[in-house]
């Protein structure tokens, strides 16, 4: 079993990085092969060019994108760790998904419509937000995010079992609350790995 972690935060001192470390620790504790794709550290190019779009239409995929697709294919659990910026993914993660989830790999179109091609995976997302979660729920943002970032993207590609956890007020909480979040991250990760065997 392989656990793929896709991480998108530029600051190695951030709380997102602590979440990453806790997720890796939980995976290692269970002896699971773990691969981390730190998009900023990799200097991943998030720009999907028109040339790349045209080439993909002919089945020509850049080797670095084929590598990312192979990791997704091999993984049983995929973890995304990122801050919610302006109601969406950080640009580098959005670009990663634009470039990697290509037609023919993530989905296809036939006479019945669009069919997702990425099956038998579980995804967990750890998302930090600047506001509190109750405020997002009150404004309906949680439903919008669920519709766009989960149903509208990953379910579309065939990943049906998508779980997400928001961690709010991230700049206001104290050390005790941060430790409680990290403990929760470890528990969720271990549970998703055990359930996925």
Map each language-model feature to its residues:
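Structured loop/turn residues at beta-strand edges in well-structured enzyme cores
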Residues: 73, 91, 118-121, 160
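A short small-residue
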Residues: 1-3, 128-131, 162-170
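Short, glycine-/small-residue-rich phosphate/pyrophosphate-handling segment
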Residues: 108-156
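A structural micro-motif
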Residues: 1, 32, 121, 159-160
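N-terminal beta1-alpha1-beta2 submodule of the flavodoxin-like/Rossmannoid cofactor-binding fold
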Residues: 1-105, 172, 176-197
């Amino acid at each position: 079993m392989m656990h793929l972690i896709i991480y998108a935060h530029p600051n190695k001192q951030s709380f997102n990085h602590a979440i990453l470390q806790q997720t890796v620790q939980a995976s290692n504790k269970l002896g699971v092969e773990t691969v981390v794709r730190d998009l900023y550290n990799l200097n991943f190019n998030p720009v999907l060019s028109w040339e790349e779009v045209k080439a993909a239409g002919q089945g020509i995929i850049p080797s670095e994108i084929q590598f990312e697709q192979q990791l997704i294919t091999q993984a049983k659990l995929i973890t995304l760790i990122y801050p919610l910026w302006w109601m969406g993914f950080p640009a580098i993660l959005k670009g990663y998904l634009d470039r990697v989830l290509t037609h023919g790999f993530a989905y296809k179109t036939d006479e019945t419509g669009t069919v997702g091609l990425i099956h038998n995976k579980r995804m967990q997302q750890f998302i930090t937000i600047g506001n509190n979660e109750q405020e997002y729920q009150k404004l309906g943002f949680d439903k919008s995010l669920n519709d766009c970032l989960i149903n509208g993207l990953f379910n579309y590609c065939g990943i049906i079992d998508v779980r997400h956890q928001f961690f709010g007020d991230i700049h206001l909480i104290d050390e005790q609350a941060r430790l409680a979040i990290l403990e929760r991250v470890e528990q969720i990760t271990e549970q998703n790995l055990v359930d996925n065997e």
